[in-house]
């Protein structure tokens, strides 16, 4: 089973570095404890965190125990690895709130898919009880400044004439290294996974665990997910795609994956789903030979929306998508309209419903001028709440739930008009 796991994640392109592949294969022949750390830098995780979360499930499916470490202490410092500038320090109260949010989120997203609940740890629980002199004596003595400043993740920052590296950030690797040693002694944790920017910290943790606990532990890093053009994947012009439905609605989340480029989608199926590599290859082959629209994006969007938001969130996202593009928006529920208001459609607020529709088309930027607006209306290219507008002098009427109108130009351009 373990050999199959390592072969599978390697075949998927999910392995960047491994501390000792041969020894790790032997170790994973029996059930192990595997952890990944997440520092609280916001009140929600985003899709950049999905690959390590999904990797924890892959290990769990292979018979291992999954641990998520929420960095209540390290989040107060900020990891400088490959960062161009120093992070802004957040207050303890803010970080504590984020720790609670992330802990709840990890459980709600992961537990429905695991054979046993994920175990959560907060490194503030042990760092808050350590005296600074004890930490320097017992942990700091095992770290060489020479090695630390020669690490590539630090060297890039030191070479920037406009940016230094504070002692606060420089000490981060000691904290993360101690996490590994602590989880090893407390839970028997033997494997740490993380992004490839964490390699230096993971290796330091392996070394510290050997020195403090006389135990051999292992690390595995995942590659930075990039698009086919080489750019970093995961953010849009509107910002991050969050896992919290209050920050990114299930509809917006679903649409993000549905709009993946053809050049990227098959790799993303390998990275983000549990479909076998053979199944993904079959989907790709069918899309290439079929004269129909590719199926891969729909499969990716369905798999991930179900994983993060459950069957109800997926059903809602699919229903909104279907109703919008079938022109049946009058049957949208209030909750679905509120998803569209949150981030699904561009919103134009009005204070009075007695407004000429041609004028509204211009104000909402669906038409460049009143003349264009009239031409669109006369060409039957404008719909409001699914009904075609044929009178250029018409005014708004019959709002959905007393305050919403969905205005549509052609097949793909929408505005949500809201009575403020």
Swiss-Prot record:
Chief location: cytoplasm
Signal peptide: none
Residues involved in L-tyrosine binding: 35, 172, 176
Provenance organism: Pseudoalteromonas translucida (strain TAC 125)
HAMAP family linked: Tyr_tRNA_synth_type1
One annotated Gene Ontology cellular component of this protein: cytosol
Enzyme Commission (EC) number: 6.1.1.1
Protein's UniProt keywords contain Heme: no
Keyword Disulfide bond among UniProt keywords: no
Reactions performed catalytically: tRNA(Tyr) + L-tyrosine + ATP = L-tyrosyl-tRNA(Tyr) + AMP + diphosphate + H(+)
Name of the protein this chain belongs to: Tyrosine--tRNA ligase 1
């Amino acid at each position: 089973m373990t050999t199959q796991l390592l072969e599978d994640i390697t075949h998927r392109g999910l392995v960047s570095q491994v501390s000792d592949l041969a020894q790790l294969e032997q170790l994973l022949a029996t059930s192990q404890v595997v952890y990944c750390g997440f520092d609280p830098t916001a009140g929600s995780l985003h899709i950049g965190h999905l690959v390590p979360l999904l990797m924890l499930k892959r290990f769990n499916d292979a018979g291992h125990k999954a641990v998520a470490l929420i960095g209540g202490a390290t989040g107060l410092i900020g990891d400088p690895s490959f960062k161009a500038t120093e992070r802004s320090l957040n207050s303890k109260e803010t970080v504590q709130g984020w720790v609670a949010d992330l802990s709840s989120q990890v459980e709600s997203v992961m537990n429905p898919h695991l054979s046993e609940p994920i175990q959560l740890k907060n490194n503030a629980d042990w760092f808050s009880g350590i005296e600074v002199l004890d930490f320097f004596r017992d942990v700091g003595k095992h770290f060489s400044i020479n090695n630390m400043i020669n690490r590539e993740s630090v060297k890039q920052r030191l070479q920037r004439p406009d940016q230094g590296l504070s002692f606060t950030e420089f000490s981060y690797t000691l904290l993360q290294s101690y996490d590994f040693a602590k989880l090893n002694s407390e839970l028997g944790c033997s494997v740490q996974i993380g992004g490839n920017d964490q390699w230096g910290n993971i290796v330091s943790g392996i070394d510290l665990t050997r020195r403090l606990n006389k135990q051999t532990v292992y690390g595995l890093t995942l590659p930075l997910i990039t698009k086919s053009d080489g750019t970093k994947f995961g953010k849009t012009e509107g910002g991050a795609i969050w896992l919290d439905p209050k920050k990114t609605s299930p509809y917006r989340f679903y649409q993000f994956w549905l709009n993946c480029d053809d050049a990227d989608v098959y790799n993303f199926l390998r990275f983000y789903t549990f479909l076998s590599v053979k199944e993904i290859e079959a989907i790709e082959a069918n899309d290439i030979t079929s004269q129909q629209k590719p199926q891969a994006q729909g499969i990716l969007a369905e798999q991930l929306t179900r994983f993060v938001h459950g069957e109800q969130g997926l059903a809602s996202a699919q229903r909104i998508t279907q109703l919008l593009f079938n022109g049946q928006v009058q049957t949208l529920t209030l909750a679905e309209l509120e998803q569209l208001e949150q981030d699904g459609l561009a919103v134009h607020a009005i204070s009075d419903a007695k407004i000429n529709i041609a004028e509204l088309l211009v104000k909402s930027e669906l038409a460049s001028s009143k003349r264009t607006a009239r031409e669109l209306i006369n060409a039957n290219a404008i719909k409001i709440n699914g009904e075609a507008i044929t009178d250029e002098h018409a005014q708004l009427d019959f709002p959905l739930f007393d305050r919403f109108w969905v205005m549509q130009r052609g097949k793909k351009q929408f505005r949500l008009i809201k009575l403020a």
